[in-house]
Amino acid sequence: MRVADFSFELPEALIAHYPQPQRSGCRLLSLDGPTGTLTHGIFTDLLDKLAPGDLLVFNNTRVIPARLFGRKASGGKLEVLVERVLDDHRVLAHVKASKAPKPGAELLLGDDESIRATMLARHDTLFELCFDDERDVFTILNAVGHMPLPPYIDRPDEDADRELYQTVYSQRPGAVAAPTAGLHFDEPMLAALQEKGIEMAFVTLHVGAGTFQPVRVDTIEDHIMHSEYAEVPQEVVDAVLACKARGKRVVAVGTTSVRSLESAAKAAENGLIAPFFGDTRIFIYPGYHYQVVDALVTNFHLPESTLIMLVSAFAGYKNTMNAYQQAVAEQYRFFSYGDAMFISRNPRAPQEKVSP
């Protein structure tokens, strides 16, 4: 399967650099997987599309201010993007510098260079850093870190992004990118969903910077997926099984919830789904048979990304590419701060051939 088959033309002007003033005020493109029918509306229409007893599964990860600017003690400027917090003082991070720091190198971080860190070791593309500070990593990052806005949001982060680039239900710090489908849910909408009898459950997947890495191979099957830490606790498993038993739909909010739930399904030796705590490299592309997820709330994704492949596996390739073509024609806003889709699963998608 060719990566190029998942390309589409996107005018620069459709990339959203700021969210809508009201979270739930974005547009919603609904795609009926079985028929391919598209419906245009606004995000609060989701209330009418869900039935009492349906289960919404959210990702409650919290974005950390993971970007730090500074320099090596020896002089050269650098930029650090924390990928994973290992303990109170150590992190794995991407380091951008004219010359990569060597083990033992001292780094001066923060806009005022007040934070000292030491480079301990290199692990492939990541650097293990230790902060020489009595405060823990999260406290340091909250004090001097910048919100790690995606590369396509071409502006410096602002104070407002600390709230805007965060879901209202985020709880577990550790992500370096927001689970963006969740950004559209505000408190009034969550209350309205509960009032209607929509069930809710929360997984955790700490989104890594790898989510923005381009696919650098020509053939999808050759791509090596990045690893992310996910947790699907017993109460989520129970909620999913209860939802299926009452004949209702499991609706994943975002591709990270999809990847968490489907990882937990793969891990189940007996039955549909089992608790899952660990790293996942699940790569979902056309041909994949979904085990758990019946419907999906998601944003619009980058051309040739693993996420548009995941959506194509869910809705069908032709349905997905047609929906994206229509979204461009109708001037929907794309990517993290953009508009949303609501998609029901196409049961014929796994058998569909991918051909532009």
Swiss-Prot record:
SUPFAM superfamilies: QueA-like. One of its GO terms (cellular component) is cytoplasm. Pathway: tRNA modification; tRNA-queuosine biosynthesis. It is an enzyme of class 2 (transferase). It is found in: Cytoplasm. Its EC number is 2.4.99.17. GO terms for biological process: queuosine biosynthetic process; tRNA wobble guanine modification. It comes from the Bacteria. Transfers and isomerizes the ribose moiety from AdoMet to the 7-aminomethyl group of 7-deazaguanine (preQ1-tRNA) to give epoxyqueuosine (oQ-tRNA). HAMAP family: QueA. Monomer. This is S-adenosylmethionine:tRNA ribosyltransferase-isomerase. The lineage of its organism: Bacteria, Pseudomonadati, Pseudomonadota, Gammaproteobacteria, Enterobacterales.
